[in-house]
Amino acid sequence: MNSASREALAAARERLDALTDNTSVDAAKLAEELASVTALLDREVSLRRVLTDPAQSGESKAELAARLLGGQVGGETLDLVSGLVRSRWSQSRDLVDSVEELANTADLTAAQRGGNLDDVEDELFRFGRIVGSDKELRSALTSRTATASAKGELLRSLLGGKAQPVTERIIVRLVTQPRGRSLEAGLDSLSKLAAERRDRMVAVVTSAVPLSDRQKQRLGAALAKLYGRQMHLNLDVDPAVLGGISVRVGDEIINGTVAERLEEATRRMAG
C-alpha cells in the first residue's frame, strides 16, 4: 500500500480497536458483517471505484454506503465502513484489503476475549503444514473448477469440532474468497495478524526432533531479546534437517541445522 492507503488503514484499525474495547460489542458478528462487505466490494468493481473516487466528497461516499448497507449490517459495521470510505485511498483494491483485514481482526479479537488466541495461532500454522504436505487436499482447496460452497463444506468437515470456531471461519473465508492470493500467502498473513494481537512477532522454528519446554522457553527469550519483541514460536519437526534448528522470522533465516552445515561444506569443496 502507498502512504494514503496506509494512513487510512491505520485510522480504521484504531477505530476498530476502540470499538472492540467495549466487550458488549459482538466481535464475531462484526467480523461476519465486515466479511460480507468485503465480498460485496470484491465482486462489484464499479462500486469500489465510486467509493474510493477522490473527486467525490467523503460525506457523499459515506451516504452511498449507508444507503447500500443500511438494514443489512449493524451500526458498528456501518460506522467502520463509513469511516473507511471517507478516507483517501491510493488504489480501490486497498479498500477491499482493509475491510478484509478488519474482519479477520474482529474475529481474532473474539478469540482473544475467549482466551483462545494461542490455539488459533497454532491451528493456522498446523493447517498450513497439513496443506503443504497433502497435494490432493491443496488441489481441492485451490481448484478453479470447484465451487466456493464445495470448498467451504470440505473445510467444515475437516475442521468442525477439531479447531476453534474462529480458526474455521477465517480459513473458510480465505479459501472461498482467495482474491488472487496463494493459500500459503493468505495463511501466513493470518498468522502474522494473529501474532500482532499480542504485539508479538512470529518465528517459524524447524528442528529434527521436538523441542523440550525448556528449550522452547530459552529460544523464545533469546529471540525476544534479539528482536526487541515477544515471539510466538510456530514449531515444525523435519527429520531431514538432521540436527540443530532453523529459525525464520519474516524474511530473515537463522540456520543452524546439520543439513545446512553439510550443504555449506559441500559447496566449499566444490568451489
Swiss-Prot record:
GO cellular component: plasma membrane; proton-transporting ATP synthase complex
UniProt GO molecular function: proton-transporting ATP synthase activity, rotational mechanism
Superkingdom of the source species: Bacteria
UniProt xrefs under InterPro entries: ATP_synth_OSCP/delta_N_sf, ATPase_OSCP/dsu
UniProt keyword annotations, A-Z: ATP synthesis, Cell membrane, CF(1), Hydrogen ion transport, Ion transport, Membrane, Transport
Subcellular location: Cell membrane
Pfam families: OSCP (PF00213)
Main subcellular localisation: membrane
Topology of this chain in the membrane: Peripheral membrane protein
Gene3D superfamilies from the UniProt entry: N-terminal domain of the delta subunit of the F1F0-ATP synthase (1.10.520.20)
Keyword Lipid biosynthesis (UniProt): no
Family: Belongs to the ATPase delta chain family.
UniProt subunit comment: F-type ATPases have 2 components, F(1) - the catalytic core - and F(0) - the membrane proton channel. F(1) has five subunits: alpha(3), beta(3), gamma(1), delta(1), epsilon(1). F(0) has three main subunits: a(1), b(2) and c(10-14). The alpha and beta chains form an alternating ring which encloses part of the gamma chain. F(1) is attached to F(0) by a central stalk formed by the gamma and epsilon chains, while a peripheral stalk is formed by the delta and b chains.
NCBIfam families on file: ATP_synt_delta, PRK13430.1
The protein's role, per its UniProt record: F(1)F(0) ATP synthase produces ATP from ADP in the presence of a proton or sodium gradient. F-type ATPases consist of two structural domains, F(1) containing the extramembraneous catalytic core and F(0) containing the membrane proton channel, linked together by a central stalk and a peripheral stalk. During catalysis, ATP synthesis in the catalytic domain of F(1) is coupled via a rotary mechanism of the central stalk subunits to proton translocation.
Protein name: ATP synthase subunit delta
